[in-house]
Swiss-Prot record:
Signal peptide stretch: none
Protein name: Brefeldin A-inhibited guanine nucleotide-exchange protein 1
Cross-referenced PANTHER family: BREFELDIN A-INHIBITED GUANINE NUCLEOTIDE-EXCHANGE PROTEIN 1, GUANYL-NUCLEOTIDE EXCHANGE FACTOR
Organism annotation: Homo sapiens
Tissue: Expressed in placenta, lung, heart, brain, kidney and pancreas.
Top-rank taxon: Eukaryota
């Protein structure tokens, strides 16, 4: 303790003694000083003696450390201040220096605190007086330089010392003094020191403020922990409801900042604006990272370094006042470092943070920035990073109203600590200093004004760059930035002094990076009015443009900033489209447009272009970086066996919604980020990409509407209304005109002035929306005319003024000046005239005041307005004309004005004028928005990039294309290529196809590979383009889609180029390509094909040219390019499932182009296809099958290429691939092999070349031989190929194919039957095809044998079929044997039967029925139905051969064979088939008899007969019904009605009239029977005959022929009728055969005749065979049905035979040849059969019940017959009846007497009549017997002896 005291006393004593020793002090005017010094020395001496320590005590501590605080020590130091104060006031530099030096040391070591109140000025502390005294030592520029340094040193110590506190005005005074020393001092060292000191002071002031808040927050945290101890487990919440340091410090509102603080700084500005306000308290919520938090220490160190640059050797502890200036500087540095290091008090060590991980730096800056030299009291801790509190709500609140309306101080904005007030005052002072205008004329770099401006800007920049959380978020500071700094910037941002301009830009950058969330409007103004304006205007200097673009380079490199600009401005309805304009401007610069007028040198232009490109590329890189989470790098994954991480894993890795992105990246591969956007990424409103997109669309609509309005107002308004952006009422439109500043004022005026009713309503609403209350008349008029330009027409102005006057009076009803609205109206008009008169350059003689007053006489209801009132109006208008408000947008000078800039001097002049105007506008706008709270959204979603890119892709593309096109500079080219690459990446990941394709096409175009002028011009940039294209393919393959086409086309051409470059002959397919005539092309003076192919040379060759081309292309063959190209193909395995399909699809397309080349087909891509097929075969099957779909299709085409070599290559490649693919095997139920092998089928089907076909068959045979065990679904293709080979005419092909098929069927089936089941059908089909090849009959027979062999497999292995599952899962397991086994075999056999020559088909038929008979017992019922459907196909008319002879042969051989075979099978399996098949068989037979084929019809009836006779015994009643019905149907269908109705054609053309009488109704039971009469009468509405079914075809044809006036229309009809007649006859015979057994009736007739000849009826003789017939199985009803048929047939025949006229007509028409047609046989046989049945029933004891009906029928039929016989005229006709009569008489004779009675009495008269005919002897004999019997029965006579035997029943 004593030591400390001693040191202090030593300082004081030495200093006082030194002052006293100075010779100046001895002078009289220093007597007061001298006295004070002596008194002080006395006191010190006394004090020292009093407090000397005991001798034995050790020295305590170091002498320079501040002593332990205690009251006793410290009060005294302050009371010795008076001598120093007086010393400082002396004019002697030496004394002043000594005094200052001592004060500095006392303060530094804590001996002088100045805490006591100042006795001279109440309310102040001593320290304030001390500082004032120190500052007072600076007397302006003439102050001694040593003293200047001492002042600086003392002030720095005072401001930075831990031991004293100075605030408010005192701090300002200290800063101000240093500032003034910097400006005033002539000494460079002093200037430098002053500047460094200032920086240091500011750092400390701001750091202390931040620190205090931090400490307090920590304190609060501790408090909270103490209170909520139970919450310790849970993590500390990151969002504190409000920041703690606002809680308990005495608030001081802004209004307490007294004016005097701003003393000498020339800052006599008003107090802080009253309107500094917001609705929430300022809060400390910052997102700043620890690195930035501690940035200040680093800067202190830097400041210290700056100082130490001037140091010289330090000469020990020389405290003399003769210290050299350098020593003072050194001292300051040393002491600063000591203070800084020494003061890192308790708890502030570098590793104070709990975990010590200082490296958690969010913005990517290096941790080295954190240095261990903290500012006094600045704890360096990473553990606490205050996060953003709910303050964000106020930041993005929608309170965009200007808060100027609210008067009075805002209660909200308060300082929570005096330190904040200090910082605020300093900051505000610097802003105001920077705003001071420079003197007119060219700026002088040495002038105070300019140096002050530059210094203030530098200091502001330093404050902003080191800003901590409080500064960044506290509302006071934010408002200060808005109100002072931004306004200052708007002034300095257009400075023509480069240094000022550059500093402004740097400050703007800092603001953009750290404060953008608060400065939305300000940033907009800066961009719009300064940056973009300078870029766009043609007159701005190169330097300005250069600096702006340098700044933009920084902005564009920061992803957050770029996206934020788009989201906050381009997507904001009220903001300018800054992003869009920026990109467009940069694009123009990058294209070098507009640089000519600037008079730039070429070098300057190029560097500007490069910078422009660099910015564009940076923007794209940012967009890539921003959306990188959407991108999947194909090379970081493989599709072979790996899947993408699941959604869940993804979200664990990174939550995409709120990723904080900082900075951008250096290359597309990099993931590092650096840059300026590292602050408060989350300081945002909600970031919803969809919402922003909607906003952007609305904005575009509004802009479009405004554009339209500015051309045609009505059109614009209509458009906006259609789009729903504008209401329809006049009020809505008026409001729109008020608010929308982008409308053309002239058009607004025209619209309002229009006489249209609606326009008037809008105008009234527009005026009514103004509020003129309380305004004087001229102000109101000014306000009214601000918004639009008055139209030219008087009537329009008239209407507007009238309404204005009315509204003015309405708003100001209390006024007494105007008698009525008329007065106001006239006055308004006169004011407008006055303003035109006074301010228009056209008016030469201006109106005087007197004239004006005179003009307005009597306008106030015939009275005058007061003269002084009019005079005031005149004066005001003369002073300022009435005009529209200046529009916000500065108009950029038009093109015409650009050309007029003749010289550089003129340009400068023009530019300065523009700059001045610009500064004015910018400042006005800045001030206007300084109170506006605009919500700022910090973008977080990667989705924004898509609309950004869609908006700007064209200018990007233009810039890059132009760059590549017209500039050979390598740097430009590499920037363009990088840009294009980024653009492609963005278009890719957001799958924006059009844009992606455009960029890829551009890239492809600049490779020069695809252009016709070709490779001759290839330069380095084109080579680089090729490399870029390849890189894109490599990195973005997953997204390229259709763009693969361009890329693969280039790669294909590149291969060709490489061949030329290396001089190698391309590997053409056939060595040399044959020309059309087959001669070899290529003569001496022709260029090789490949040159022609690339469009390089014409016909004749310049070999030198070729050599140079080879050289320029050489680099395309460099190893790197070749490897990179290969990598695309080998890397194809990493493409995802969709991408690989696109890749393959386009590779195939390119390959097709290569192969189709007329001059020289190439196979480069085809080989690549084979390669990638190998690489990708391991993909999951699903993907592979999609790939193969494309490749397979390509092989299909290539395999059919007319060039055989190409096809051979294709087939061979296919074979190799297939072998590899088959090796992998296949699981059950998959179909991949089938898809894979399909090209073989296609080639076989389409390619007619024997070589290729042979090769295909050999390939397949090889597969079967080597891979049979692995083949599953592939069997289908194999059989399909052999099926195609089977019909070949080339023996070797057929032979090889058949051999292999045989091998499969006999051996492979044996071993691998289950694997082949799926294609079992195909195998059978294939064999069937071999059987049908007529050229090789032996093969055919062998094939049928193999089919028989297949049947054996099915029979032996039914289980295999049952177990087999496949696509047709709807087939029940038990049916699978049928569907997959039996049915195919039988079906194919039926095909063979239908297709082959007689011997083969007969063999087929035999085998078919053999199989049925052999294996039929295993068949289910429903299988038989299917089977017979096939069998009946043999009779299918459509399948029959056309030629008549063959048809006949077919009928006689195959059909008969088949019909009988069917009967056999039916009979064999009757039990199963009767109820299943009988209907079908009957239907088939019914169908047979309807065909126009006699043979078929006969077979049908025969078959019916056979089936019934063979099986009738087993028929049920039901089946018999069916049988009868079938017979009935056939009968009815085949009655040839047309024989009766047909008429010969009366005229040549007209059809015959309908016959007036129809003998019987056309009762066609079956649709299929058609009456001629019927079909000639068209029934359909449209008068076309309805087409009847098959059997009517002839008739139908007949009709159509009648209509087409054919010569012999009847022939076809007659043929059909003839067949019907035949069938009728056959059918009668059939019924007879069925009922009585074949040949029975014939026998009976013969016997009857014989008996008659013997003249004896042997009653006892019974026919033995009677019971063989089916009679006994038929019921009486069924028999009656058959009877009805027979009798109908009989009656028809009778009718026809009786119709002589008709028969003659038919005969004449050529029906039935030589004689007249008749139906005698039908007439007689039908009746005969009927009679037999009736008599049989009559005699049948078992049918007693039916006897009565039988008798009745008999009587009717017989009497009718006899009557008819009597009418017959022709001998031959009667002859035909002989047997019939014999039968009738014989049968009647055999019945019992009782019955005979009934019959004889009935027939008696008729029989008597018969006697008159010339009958044959036999008949006569029987008649005789009859009459004799009558005699006996009726007892007319006695019976002769021999006849007594007749039974008398």
């Amino acid at each position: 303790m004593y030591e400390g005291k001693k040191t202090k006393n030593m300082f004081l004593t030495r200093a006082l003694e030194k002052i006293l020793a100075d010779k100046e002090v001895k002078k009289a005017h220093h007597s007061q000083l001298r006295k004070a010094c002596e008194v002080a020395l006395e006191e010190i001496k006394a004090e020292t003696e009093k407090q000397s320590p005991p001798h034995g005590e050790a020295k305590a501590g170091s002498s320079t450390l501040p002593p332990v605080k205690s009251k006793t020590n410290f009060i005294e130091a302050d009371k010795y201040f008076l001598p120093f104060e007086l010393a400082c006031q002396s004019k002697c530099p030496r004394i002043v220096s000594t005094s200052l030096d001592c004060l500095q040391k006392l303060i530094a070591y804590g001996h002088l605190t100045g805490n006591a109140p100042d006795s001279t000025t109440p309310g102040k502390k001593l320290i304030d007086r001390i500082i004032e005294t120190i500052c007072g030592c600076f007397q302006g520029p003439q102050t001694d330089e040593g003293v200047q340094l001492q002042i600086i040193k003392a002030l720095l110590t005072a401001v930075t010392s831990q031991h004293i506190e100075i605030h408010e005005g005192t701090v300002l005074q200290a800063v101000r003094t240093c500032y003034n020393i910097y400006l005033a001092s002539k000494n460079l060292i002093n200037q430098t020191t002053a500047k460094a000191t200032l920086t240091q002071m500011l750092n400390v002031i701001f750091a202390r403020m931040e620190n205090q808040a931090l400490q307090e927050a920590k304190q609060m945290e501790k408090e909270r922990h103490r209170q909520h101890h139970h919450l310790l487990q849970s993590p500390v919440s990151h969002h504190e409801p409000e920041s703690p340091q606002l809680r308990y410090l005495p608030p001081q509102t802004v209004d307490h900042i007294s004016q005097e603080h701003e003393g000498d700084l020339d800052l006599h500005t008003n107090d802080v604006d009253k309107s500094l306000q917001d609705d929430t308290e300022p809060e400390n919520g910052s997102d700043i990272s620890s690195a930035e938090n501690e940035q200040t220490e680093a800067d202190q160190a830097t400041a210290a370094e700056t100082l130490s640059k001037n140091e010289v050797l330090y000469d020990g502890e020389n405290h003399d006042c003769e210290e050299k200036p350098q020593d003072i500087v050194q001292n300051i540095v040393e002491e600063m470092v000591n203070i800084v290091v020494g003061d890192m008090g308790e708890g502030t060590t570098i590793n104070a943070s709990a975990d010590g991980n200082i490296g958690t730096i969010e913005d990517g800056s290096d941790s080295e920035n954190i240095q261990a030299n903290g500012i006094p009291g600045t704890p360096i801790s990473v553990a606490y990073t205050p996060s953003l509190p709910d303050d964000r709500l106020s930041v993005s609140s929608n309170d965009t109203q200007e808060s100027g309306n609210s008067s009075g101080p805002s209660p909200g904005a308060k300082f929570s600590h005096i330190l904040q007030k200090d910082a605020f005052l300093v900051f505000r002072s610097l802003c105001k200093l920077s705003m001071k205008p420079l003197s007119d004329g060219p700026p002088d770099p040495k002038s105070h004004e300019l140096r002050s401006k530059i210094l203030s800007l530098q200091l502001l920049l330093s404050i902003l760059q080191n800003a901590g959380p409080i500064f960044r978020t506290n509302e006071m500071f934010i408002n200060a930035i808005k109100q002072y700094l931004c306004v200052a910037l708007s002034k300095n941002g257009v400075s023509s002094v480069p240094e000022v301009f550059e500093l402004s830009l740097s400050i703007f950058l800092t603001l953009l990076s750290n404060f953008k969330t608060h400065l939305k409007m300000q940033i907009e103004v800066f961009f719009k009015e300064i940056f973009l304006y300078i870029l766009e205007t043609s007159t701005s200097s190169f330097d300005h443009k250069w600096m702006v673009i340098q700044t933009l380079t920084r902005i564009c490199a920061d992803a957050q900033s770029v996206v934020d600009i788009y989201v906050n401005y381009d997507c904001d309805l009220n903001a300018a489209n800054i992003f869009e304009r920026l990109v467009n401007d940069l694009s123009k610069i990058a294209q070098g447009r507009g640089s000519q007028e600037l008079g730039m040198s070429n070098v300057q232009e190029l560097s500007l272009r490069k910078k422009g490109l660099e910015c564009l590329v940076s923007i794209l890189k940012c967009m890539v970086e921003w959306s990188k989470d959407q991108y999947v790098n194909p090379n970081s994954q493989t599709t072979l066996g790996q899947e993408k991480p699941s959604e869940q894993e993804m979200s664990e890795i990174k939550h995409p919604e709120t990723i904080n992105r900082y900075g951008s990246l250096n290359s597309l591969e990099s993931t590092s980020s650096s840059g300026i956007g590292s602050y408060s990424t989350q300081m945002s409103g909600t970031d919803n990409p969809e919402q922003f997109e909607v906003l952007k669309q609305q904005k575009e609509i509004i802009e479009q509407g405004i554009d339209l309005f500015n051309k045609k107002p009505k059109r614009g308004i209509q458009y906006l209304q259609e789009q729903g952006m504008l209401g329809t009422t006049p009020e809505d439109i008026a409001q729109f005109l008020h608010q929308e500043e982008r409308l053309d004022s002239t058009q607004v005026g025209e619209f309002l002035g229009d006489n249209d009713k609606f326009n008037k309503e809008v105008m009234y609403a527009y005026v009514d929306q103004h509020d003129f209350s309380g305004k004087d008349f001229v102000s109101a008029l000014r306000m009214f005319l601000e918004g639009f330009r008055l139209p030219g027409e008087a009537q329009k102005i008239d209407r507007l003024m009238e309404k204005f006057a009315a509204r003015y009076l309405e708003c100001n009803q209390g006024q007494t000046l105007f008698a009525s609205a008329d007065t106001a109206y006239v006055l308004a008009y006169s004011i407008i005239m006055l303003t035109t008169d006074l301010h228009s350059p056209q008016v030469k003689n201006k109106m005087t005041k007197e004239q004006y007053i005179k003009m307005n006489r009597g306008i106030n209801d015939s009275k005058d307005l007061p003269e002084e009132y009019l005079s005031a109006i005149y004066n005001e208008i003369a002073g300022k004309k009435i005009s529209m408000k200046e529009t916000k947008e500065l108009t950029i000078p038009t093109k015409s004005s650009k050309q007029n800039v003749a010289s550089e001097k003129q340009r400068r002049l023009l530019y300065n004028l523009e700059m001045e105007q610009m500064a004015k506008t910018a400042k006005a706008l800045m001030e206007a928005v300084s109170h506006v709270q605009a919500p700022f959204t910090s973008a977080t979603h990667l989705e924004h990039v898509r609309p950004m890119f869609k908006l700007a892709w064209t200018p990007f593309l233009a810039a890059f294309s132009v760059g590549l096109q017209d500039c050979d500079d390598t740097e430009v080219a590499s920037l363009c290529l990088e840009g294009i690459r980024c653009a492609i990446r963005i278009a890719c990941i957001f799958s924006i196809q059009l844009e992606r394709d455009a960029y890829v096409q551009a890239l492809a175009r600049f490779t020069l590979l695809t252009v016709s002028s070709g490779i001759t011009e290839m330069k380095q940039k084109n080579i680089d383009t090729i490399k870029t294209l390849i890189t894109v393919a490599h990195t973005d393959g997953n997204y390229l889609g259709n763009s693969w086409h361009e890329i693969l086309k280039c790669i294909s051409q590149l291969e060709l180029a490489q061949l030329i470059g290396t001089g190698v002959k391309p590997r053409y397919i056939s060595g040399t390509v044959r020309g059309r005539e087959g001669s070899l092309t290529g003569t001496k003076d022709q260029a090789p094909d490949e040159f022609v192919g690339l469009g390089l040379v014409g016909g004749n060759v310049d070999w030198k040219q070729i050599a140079s081309i080879q050289e320029s292309i050489g680099e395309t063959s460099s190893q790197s390019v070749v490897v990179a190209v290969d990598r695309i193909f080998t890397g194809s395995t990493r493409l995802d499932g969709n991408a690989i399909v696109d890749f393959v699809r386009w590779l195939c397309a390119v390959s097709m182009d290569e192969l189709l080349s007329t001059t020289h087909p190439r196979m480069f891509s085809l080989q690549k296809i084979v390669e990638i097929s190998y690489y990708n075969m391991g993909r999951i099957r699903l993907q592979w099958s999609r790939i193969w779909e494309v490749i397979g299709d390509h092989f299909n085409k290539v395999g059919c290429n007319p060039n055989e070599d190409v096809a051979i290559f294709a087939v061979d490649s296919l074979r190799q691939l297939s072998m590899k693919f088959l090796e992998k095997g296949e699981l059950a139920n998959f179909r991949f092999q089938k898809d894979f092998l399909r090209p073989f089928e296609h080639i076989m089907k389409r390619n007619r070349s024997p070589t290729i076909r042979d090769m295909v068959v050999r390939c397949i045979a090889q597969m079967v031989n080597s891979q049979a065990a692995n083949i599953r679904s592939g069997w289908k293709n194999i059989f399909s190929v052999f099926h195609l080979a089977a019909s070949d005419q080339d023996e070797s092909i057929v032979e090889l194919a058949f051999q292999t098929t045989g091998h499969i069927v006999t051996l492979v089936f044996e071993k691998h039957f289950p694997a082949t089941i799926d294609s079992f059908q195909d195998a059978v089909k294939c064999l069937s095809e071999f059987a049908c090849n007529a050229a090789f009959p032996d093969t055919s027979m062998e094939a049928i044998r193999l089919i028989r062999h297949c049947a054996k497999y099915v029979s032996d292995r039914p289980q295999a079929f049952k177990e087999y599952t496949s696509d047709d899962m709807n087939v029940a397991p038990e049916d699978r044997v049928w569907v997959r086994g039996w049915f195919p075999i039988l079906f194919e056999l039926s095909c063979i039967i239908n297709r082959c020559k007689l011997d083969v088909r007969t063999r087929g038929l035999t085998v078919m029925f053999e199989i049925m008979k052999t294996y039929g017992h295993t068949y289910e019922k429903h299988w038989w139905q299917d089977l017979f459907r096939i069998v009946f196909r043999i009779f299918d008319n459509m399948k029959l051969p056309e030629q008549q002879t063959e048809k006949a042969e077919w009928m006689t051989t195959t059909c008969n064979h088949a019909l009988y075979a069917i009967c056999d099978v039916f009979t064999q399996y009757l039990e199963v088939l009767s109820d299943v098949l009988l209907d079908d068989i009957f239907a088939q037979l019914y169908w047979c008899v309807q065909q126009d084929n006699e043979q078929l019809a006969r077979s049908g009836t025969n078959c019916l007969e056979n089936v019934v006779i063979l099986n009738g015994e087993k028929f049920t009643l039901e089946i018999w019904d069916k049988t009868c019905n079938c017979t009935l149907d056939i009968f009815k269908t085949t009655i040839p009605h047309a024989l009766l109705t047909w008429r010969p054609n009366s005229g040549e053309t007209a059809p015959p009239p309908p016959s007036p009488v129809s003998e019987k109704p056309l009762d066609t039971i079956s649709q299929k029977s058609v009456d001629i009469h019927d079909s000639i009468q068209p029934r359909s509405v449209d008068n076309r005959p309805q087409a009847p079914l098959v059997s009517a075809s002839a008739v139908n044809e007949e009709v159509s022929k009648i209509k087409s006036t054919a010569k012999f229309p009847e022939q076809k009809l007659f043929a059909a009728l003839l067949i019907k007649c035949v069938v009728q006859l056959e059918l009668i015979q059939t019924i007879d055969n069925i009922v009585f057994f074949p040949a029975t009736s014939k026998k009976e007739d013969a016997e009857n005749l014989a008996a008659a000849q013997r003249d004896a009826v042997d009653f006892d003789v019974r026919v033995d065979t009677q019971d063989q017939g089916m009679y006994r199985f038929l019921t009486s009803q069924q028999l009656f049905k058959l009877l009805d048929c027979l009798l109908e047939s009989h009656r028809f025949a009778k009718a026809f035979n009786s119709n002589n006229e008709q028969r003659t007509a038919l005969w004449k028409a050529g029906f039935k040849g030589k004689s007249k047609p008749n139906l005698l046989k039908q007439e007689t046989s039908s009746l005969a059969c009927g009679l037999r049945i009736l008599f049989r029933m009559y005699m049948d004891e078992s049918r007693v019940s039916a006897w009565e009906e039988v008798q009745q029928r008999l009587l009717n039929v017989c009497s009718e017959a006899l009557s008819y016989f009597l009418t017959l005229t022709s001998e031959s006709h009667r002859e035909a009846w002989t047997n019939l009569l014999l039968l009738f008489l014989t049968k009647v004779l055999k019945i019992s007497d009782n019955r005979f009675k009934a019959h004889a009495s009935f027939y008696y008269p008729l029989l008597c009549e018969i006697m008159q005919f010339d009958l044959i002897p036999e008949l006569r004999a029987v008649l005789r017997r009859f009459f004799l019997r009558i005699g006996v029965v009726f007892q007319i006579s006695q019976p002769p002896e021999q006849e007594l035997g007749i039974n008398k029943q």
